[in-house]
Swiss-Prot record:
Compartment(s) of residence: Cytoplasm
Keyword Flavoprotein among UniProt keywords: no
Catalytic activity: acetate + ATP = acetyl phosphate + ADP
Gene: ackA
Enzyme class: transferase
Protein's name according to its UniProt entry: Acetate kinase
């Protein structure tokens, strides 16, 4: 028996989950927020308890020290050496990493170089990796890449219709993201349907603050909505999703607050989507509250959101030439029944129908009617468990 930590590190946060392996039992979980800012928050959940402390945490190394000390302080572990592995979620692996790998200096260097593909994610992941290597240098450290699952896409799918020199010289192509989540829920869908994954055509919809949809053919990703970066695809919480690229130079010319392309991309990443259109929030719960109040901006944001998701799902029916099931997962996918109802309501032509008694908050499983030709499933994603499993698998390959 051993203990493994799954880590999802951002620029100012560190989310973690501690497992007893190979039993896959969750021993504790938590998050450290506002790293590098005043009044950082460290939250630990274990044995039905929740402990929270506010303190100043200056960097990721300090955050990891506090996390490990908390595990000892709360009696979750007796000593550091009980932890034998750590797995790190890394958003962008580019073409270099087609599967999870054990960390070494070269791997870490590549992750930092690939930050251009995920500027909001990879730098934080690299900081988390460095912190654990500094404090626990002897344990197995593994990187699990969001992009790995999508390396099965065909060249005609991942290339953009621009001169090929931009791919050969600069590696401009579709990479996708959320691959760990899409892979996991596809496997769970096969179990739920009682059929081999290798026989199924699935559309998996990861709908959280970030949104990505994937066409899964016989267990492999054949297309996905996120692209060169996680900015592409349907509308998201704070991200615009797909827009006409000519808008970028136009806005630079017209708006004095947007001085260059970086300013526009920052706006598209952090100030757009549900939040930007509604002027209220990136949280679907707040948007739905706005619907109840007949707030016109909330209504508009919601309608754009539903429209973009329906269009993306619809195109993947064409990519797969039909599908056996549609899977909803992640924060909104799992917990927003109104959103699911309105998405499916625009896709009934494909033979989908949901049971309103099952399409309720908190329900997991098959929410379609017996007559539905395409099954509609709600499955909780578990990226942390996937990460812990890969650590366990790779422990003896250092």
């Amino acid at each position: 028996m051993s203990k493994t930590i799954a880590i999802n590190a951002g620029s100012s946060s560190l989310k973690w989950q501690l497992y007893q392996m190979p039993e896959e039992a969750v021993l504790a979980q938590g998050i450290i927020e506002r790293i590098g800012l005043k009044d950082s928050i460290s939250t630990v959940k274990y044995d039905g308890k929740k402990e929270e402390q506010i303190l100043d945490i200056h960097d990721h190394t300090e955050a990891v020290k506090i996390l490990l000390n908390d595990l000892i302080h709360f009696g979750i572990i007796a000593a550091y050496d009980e932890i034998t592995g750590v797995g790190h979620r890394v958003v962008a692996g580019g073409e270099l990493f087609k599967e999870s790998v054990v960390v070494n200096d070269k791997v870490l260097e590549h992750i930092e170089e690939l930050s251009v593909l995920a500027p909001l994610h990879n730098p934080g992941a690299a900081a988390g990796i460095r912190a654990f290597r500094d404090i626990l240098p002897d344990i197995t450290s593994v990187c699990v890449f969001d992009t790995s699952f999508h390396t099965s896409m065909a060249k005609h799918t991942y290339l953009y219709p621009i001169p090929q020199k931009y791919y050969t010289d600069y590696k401009v192509r579709k990479y996708g993201a959320h691959g760990t989540s899409h892979k996991y829920v596809a496997q769970e869908a096969a179990k739920m349907l009682g059929r081999p994954l290798e026989e199924l055509k699935l559309i998996t919809a990861h709908i959280g603050n970030g949104v990505s949809i994937t066409a899964n053919y016989h267990g492999k990703s054949v297309d996905t909505s996120m692209g060169f970066t996680p900015l592409a695809g349907p509308m998201m919480g704070t991200r615009s999703g797909d827009i006409d690229p000519a808008i970028i130079p136009y806005l630079i010319e017209q708006d004095p607050e947007l001085k260059d392309a970086a300013d526009v991309v920052n706006m598209l990443n952090k100030k757009s989507g549900l939040s930007g259109v509604s002027g209220i929030s990136s949280d679907m719960r707040d948007i739905e509250a706005g619907l109840q109040e007949d707030n016109p901006d909330a209504v508009l944001a919601y309608n754009i959101f539903i429209d973009r998701i329906k269009k993306c799902i619809g195109q993947y029916f064409a990519v797969l030439n039909g599908a056996d099931a549609l899977v909803f997962t992640a924060g909104m996918g799992e917990n927003a029944p109104l959103m699911r109802q309105d998405v499916i309501g625009g896709l009934t032509w494909f033979g989908m129908d949901i049971d309103p008694e099952k399409n309720v908050f908190g329900y997991r499983g098959d929410i379609s009617t017996p007559e539905s030709k395409v099954k509609v499933l709600v499955i909780s994603t578990d990226e942390e468990l996937c990460i812990a499993r890969d650590v366990e698998r790779l422990k003896n390959t250092k």
